[in-house]
């Protein structure tokens, strides 16, 4: 299989962190990772559009030559294809809560973070949009408070003692925030401590560039 990605973008980074975490658990998927240079517009060229007609990354080329183009679908496909030492473990209730947490982070936090970054210091050269940035910053506060409260029980990772996809999703967006030089934590020491712990993990050390 081949993963077409770009190291900074949150959605590809989520998948890359997921793969690296599974590697740390002894699951070797043999997925080649290929950079698509989005700064040069390679994601909008015919070669990549043949993989993903929406012109986004990531795109996972399967062994049969077809593609998956949504990050969470890629993760769940790999969970099913390599069912040993997965990141979704435990009772149906525990798995449901882990998936719920990942969606909260991706939809309620990751989206505003990405828009905020591009509205303030876009790596793609987009013009600043102060009003949009202010709206996104306001939207981030409730989910950030939710995560701070979640960590108040002493858990080392977002889902408890074991890493899950929610950790990968949050860290992928935070890397983008670091790149655009934005500190989103504010007065949230537990989230800041989680960030330091997660970034010290071998998987994070192998994947994160910022």
Which residues make up each language-model segment?
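GST-like domain detector, emphasizing the conserved glutathione-binding G-site
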Residues: 1-134
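GST-like fold's C-terminal all-alpha helical module
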Residues: 105-200
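A generic structural-conservation signal
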Residues: 28, 33, 186, 207-208
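Active-site-flanking alpha-helical
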Residues: 79, 173-174, 208
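Generic structural signal for short, solvent-exposed loop/turn connectors between secondary structure elements
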Residues: 1-2, 155, 209-210
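Short histidine-centered beta-strand/loop micro-motifs
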Residues: 89-90, 159-160, 207
């Amino acid at each position: 299989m081949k993963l077409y990605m770009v190291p900074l973008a949150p959605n590809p980074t989520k998948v890359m962190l997921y793969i690296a975490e599974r590697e740390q658990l002894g699951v070797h998927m043999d997925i080649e990772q290929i950079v698509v240079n989005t700064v040069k517009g390679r994601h909008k060229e015919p070669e990549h559009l043949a993989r993903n007609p929406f012109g986004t990354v990531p795109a996972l080329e399967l062994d049969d030559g077809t593609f998956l183009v949504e990050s969470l679908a890629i993760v769940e496909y790999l969970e099913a294809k390599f069912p040993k030492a997965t990141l979704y473990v435990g009772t149906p209730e525990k798995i449901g809560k882990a998936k719920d947490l990942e969606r909260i982070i991706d939809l309620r936090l990751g989206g505003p973070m990405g828009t905020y970054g591009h509205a303030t210091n876009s790596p793609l050269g987009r013009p600043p949009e102060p009003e949009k940035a202010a709206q996104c910053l306001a939207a981030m506060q409730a989910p950030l408070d939710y995560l701070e409260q979640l960590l108040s029980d002493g858990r080392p990772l977002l889902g408890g003692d074991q890493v899950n996809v929610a950790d990968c999703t949050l860290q992928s967006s935070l890397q983008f925030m670091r790149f655009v030089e934005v500190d989103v934590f504010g007065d949230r020491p537990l989230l800041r401590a989680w960030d330091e712990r997660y970034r010290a993990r071998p998987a994070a050390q192998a994947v994160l560039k910022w």
